[in-house]
Amino acid sequence: MESNLWFVYAVVTMLFWGVWGAFIERPEKNGFPATLGYAVWALTMVPCAAVALWVIGWVPEHDLRSIVLGSAAGLLGAAGQLVLFDTLRRGPAYLVFPVISLSPVVSVLLSVLLLGETASPRAWAGIVLALLAMPLLSYQPASPSSPAKGRLWFVLALLVFLAWGIQAYVLRFANATMRSESIFFYMTVTGLLLVPVAVWMTDFRRPINWGPSGPWLAAPIQLLNSIGALTMVYAFRHGKVIIVSPMINALAPVITIVLSLLLYRVVPHRVVVAGMALAAVAFYLMA
């Protein structure tokens, strides 16, 4: 890993995504659908991409390899998000999120097998603890009012699990031959291309809040997500997937949980508290 830049970018990503996670439900609870929230997120990627392009003189790599790798990273992330919307319609969140939360397992395996990444015994201990913490942090008590509908939800959850796990590997692989700014540009383009799909998935038969507490609230919240996505790409440029991916995915939810406790007085379940403890130890070991 190159100096400690990976750590700085990873921490910034965790902070932005942690705060984003604490507020992301507000627009939806106010009547602004999550699918349209995706469209807002895709638009907030544009100013971040503009900054990235400015850094490299407004000329991203445009050879076929760069276009394919950058677009693949974007499609895996954005398509995974859209599939998640449909997954949550078919299966309860308390079953879906523990499956998806383990996507860094895919990232770690691919990076070890295909990139030959290694880590110290101390870091490996942190990686294992982070992977154990993720399903605990996403734990939600079973609810009789939201039973699973068939088995398709599990297949869809696995698709998201694979997509997001492979995305982290692709980001690191792409960073070896192209600039991070170019990767983010293509991620933005592919995210925008899928906006019509998100709009198509929206149920316009239900009332939609188009006011200040709807899309206008979603915009600054989603901007946090977009900035975090940009710094995540930089983190993968300077750091190893086997360290960066588990760290970000384990620590960002901890920040969300702490903020939810402070802002909404939401007391986490003891299973979640156990996950927070594991994540904290993992962070110390991997830092």
Regions inferred by a protein language model and the residue ranges of each:
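Hydrophobic alpha-helical transmembrane segments in multi-pass integral membrane proteins
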Residues: 49-56, 108-119, 164-176, 225-237, ...
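Structural signal for membrane-spanning alpha-helices in multi-pass inner-membrane proteins
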Residues: 49-56, 81-84, 108-111, 130-141, ...
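Juxtamembrane helix-loop boundary signature in multi-pass membrane transporters
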Residues: 1-11, 105-162, 269-287
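Membrane-interface interhelical linkers
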Residues: 1-75, 82-90, 121, 141-158, ...
